[in-house]
Amino acid sequence: MNIKKVDKYSFLEFKDDKFSLYFSTAENGLNFNINTEEGNDNIRNLKDWFNVKDVGYLKQTHSDIILNYDSDKELLEGDALITDKDNTLVGVFTADCVPVLLYDKSKNVMAAVHSGWKGTSDMIVKKTIIKMKQEFLSTASDITVYIGPHNKACCYEFGEEALSEFEGSGIYDISEIYKDGKLDLEKCIVKQCKSENVNNIKCLNICTNCSKEYKMFSYRRDGKSAGRMFSFIIKK
C-alpha cells in the first residue's frame, strides 16, 4: 500500500497492472458528501487529480441494485457499479459502511460496491460477482477483491432484532459473524466471495471508528456532521 498525496489530501493507493485502487481519507477534511457543494466540487476535481475522462458514482440507497456504468450524465440510484471502460473511475461513498472494490485483469472489468449492513444481508457483493461472471464472463480465479475501511467488528454495535436479516442465507453462521453485540461485516463479505469461489481477497483492516493510524470519517462516531469518503477504482 502507498499513500498518494494530492494537494493537501491523502489517498490509500494500490496498483495492479492497468488497475489503480484508491480509498480517500479524512485528512485535512476531504469530504465527498454529494449533498454538499464541497462534496460535488471534490467529485469534479477527481478528473484532474487522477487524469480520467469519466467519474461514475450513484445515489446510494442501501439496496442490492447493481448497474453497468455508461456515462456520468445522469445520477442513478443503486449501490454497485460495474464497467469495462478505459480511462474511467467508478466509486462509492462511505462513512462506516463497507467499500468493496473488485477487478478482473483477464476480462478487464472492475466494480465498486457500497455494502452497509442492509446491502451485506442482501449479499450485494456476491451478486456483483455473479453479474461479473454472467455479463463479462469473469471466472472466480481471475477476480480480486479489496475490502476497504469501515466500522469493523471491534466497534460495530448491532441490535439482535435485525439479525434475522442474515439468517437463511445458507452462507452465514450467526455465531461466527455476531459476538458480544457486534457484527462483523468484513467476515460476511469474505463469506460471500468464497461462496462464489473467489479467494483472492485483500482486507485493509482499518476501522473508521477507532483507527489511530489513518484519519477517517465515521457516522457512528461523529453523527450527522460526519463527511463522506470515496473509494474508487480506475482502469487506464
From Swiss-Prot:
Keyword field: Copper, Hydrolase, Metal-binding, Oxidoreductase, Transferase, Zinc
Record keyword Oxidoreductase present: yes
Entries under InterPro entries matching the protein: Cu_polyphenol_OxRdtase (IPR003730), Cu_polyphenol_OxRdtase_sf (IPR038371), Cytotoxic_necrot_fac-like_cat (IPR011324)
Enzyme Commission designation: 2.4.2.1, 3.5.4.4, 2.4.2.28
Gene Ontology MF term list: adenosine deaminase activity; copper ion binding; oxidoreductase activity; S-methyl-5-thioadenosine phosphorylase activity
Superkingdom in the source lineage: Bacteria
Matching SUPFAM superfamilies: CNF1/YfiH-like putative cysteine hydrolases
Reactions the enzyme catalyzes: adenosine + phosphate = alpha-D-ribose 1-phosphate + adenine; S-methyl-5'-thioadenosine + phosphate = 5-(methylsulfanyl)-alpha-D-ribose 1-phosphate + adenine; inosine + phosphate = alpha-D-ribose 1-phosphate + hypoxanthine; adenosine + H2O + H(+) = inosine + NH4(+)
Cofactor(s) required, per the database record: Cu(2+); Zn(2+)
Binding residue positions for Zn(2+): H62, C97, H114
CDD domains: YfiH
Family note: Belongs to the purine nucleoside phosphorylase YfiH/LACC1 family.
Subunit architecture: Homodimer.
Its biological purpose: Purine nucleoside enzyme that catalyzes the phosphorolysis of adenosine and inosine nucleosides, yielding D-ribose 1-phosphate and the respective free bases, adenine and hypoxanthine. Also catalyzes the phosphorolysis of S-methyl-5'-thioadenosine into adenine and S-methyl-5-thio-alpha-D-ribose 1-phosphate. Also has adenosine deaminase activity.
Listed PANTHER family: PURINE NUCLEOSIDE PHOSPHORYLASE LACC1, UNCHARACTERIZED PROTEIN YFIH
Protein name: Purine nucleoside phosphorylase CA_C1699
Organism: Clostridium acetobutylicum (strain ATCC 824 / DSM 792 / JCM 1419 / IAM 19013 / LMG 5710 / NBRC 13948 / NRRL B-527 / VKM B-1787 / 2291 / W)
